[in-house]
Regions:
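Alpha-helical transmembrane segments and immediately membrane-proximal extracytoplasmic
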Residues: 1-308
Length: 308
């Protein structure tokens, strides 16, 4: 009888252990499902912010190009030059107040995801990055859309992680999801953006990170497709290769070497100019005149070459 009671108590413990273990597994699944749902929300918000950023860049580019293509009288260039200079002074003031909004955006995002730096005021910095990027582009400076879009997405991920009180270990995944959503909003390519984020920004192939980044990218890409039904990258003609694959390999290798050398030369030249620019002993608003002047001259030369 005692043996039977011991066996019954042991069986009760086993059932309780299975129940607790099963509940623990379901709890983990619910936490993962919540993370995936929140990542989709991050993608939606990122699309609603990054897509207007892309649209305004597109609109201001054509507006500026139309102005120079119309060949206005010389006196119209004076107020535009002064306006561009004032914009650059204001943007430099913003960067002085919030240094993280300066630069391309991808190195800053990588630093935040890796825990080296933090966003203290993500909403204010996101608005400043948005406004500063639009104004700088309208002033004629050469700015890409992928880097700022990535950083804007990481700002959204940081904000949502604070609003939803997400677990500390999952904040990094929301930052990566926001970065991927920003890239997907810029190019309407969710799968490519997820791979780029995992490879060059997050650099960690956790399944959760891949899933959250892909979900956020799909939602942001859907928002971008609604605003821009015709993706300009889809208009690129694809031609069938003439040579065999093994014959093409040597050309691919040669192209890789040429692109690597040119890219390294461009990067080294940019860094050299940065050091020279930093050594100029003049106030920032005076040095900005040189930047605006160079951008203005390039715009004039480009219009004249197109007109010819």
């Amino acid at each position: 009888m005692e043996l039977w009671d011991k066996a019954e108590r042991l069986w009760t413990r086993v059932k309780n252990w299975k129940t607790v273990r099963g509940w623990h597994i379901w709890k983990l699944k619910l936490v993962d499902a919540r993370l995936y749902f929140v990542s989709m929300f991050v993608g939606l918000l990122t699309g609603l912010v990054a897509v207007p950023y892309h649209y305004l860049l597109y609109y201001l580019f054509h507006l500026r190009s139309g102005f120079f293509a119309s060949h206005p009288a010389w006196y119209w260039h004076i107020p535009l030059f002064l306006f561009s200079w004032g914009i650059l002074v204001f943007v430099m003031w913003l960067v002085g107040k919030m240094p993280l909004i300066g630069g391309g955006g991808i190195p800053q995002t990588r630093g935040v995801i890796n825990g080296r730096i933090t966003y203290r005021h993500p909403f204010i910095e996101m608005v400043s990055k948005f406004v500063g990027g639009i104004l700088s582009f309208s002033a004629g400076l050469s700015l890409g859309r992928e880097g700022p879009s990535v950083q804007i997405g990481s700002y959204v991920g940081s904000l949502v992680s604070r609003w939803t009180h997400i677990l500390k270990g999952e904040q990094k995944q929301l930052l990566a999801a926001g970065a991927g959503a920003g890239l997907a909003a810029a190019f309407a390519a969710p799968l490519a953006s997820s791979l780029i984020v995992i490879e060059s920004i997050e650099r960690f192939d956790a399944p959760k990170t891949a899933i959250t980044t892909l979900l956020a990218g799909v939602v942001a890409g859907a928002v971008a497709s609604m605003v821009f039904p015709v993706n300009p990258y889809h208009l690129i003609e694809v031609t069938e290769p003439v040579f065999a694959f093994f014959v093409q390999m040597k050309y691919f290798l040669i192209l890789a070497v040429i692109v690597s050398v040119c890219g390294k030369f461009y990067s080294s030249t940019m860094n050299a100019f940065r050091h020279v620019y930093a050594k100029v002993n003049s106030p920032a608003y005076v040095k900005n005149v040189l930047s605006v002047l160079v951008a203005y001259i390039i715009s004039l030369m480009q219009v004249k070459s197109d007109w010819r």
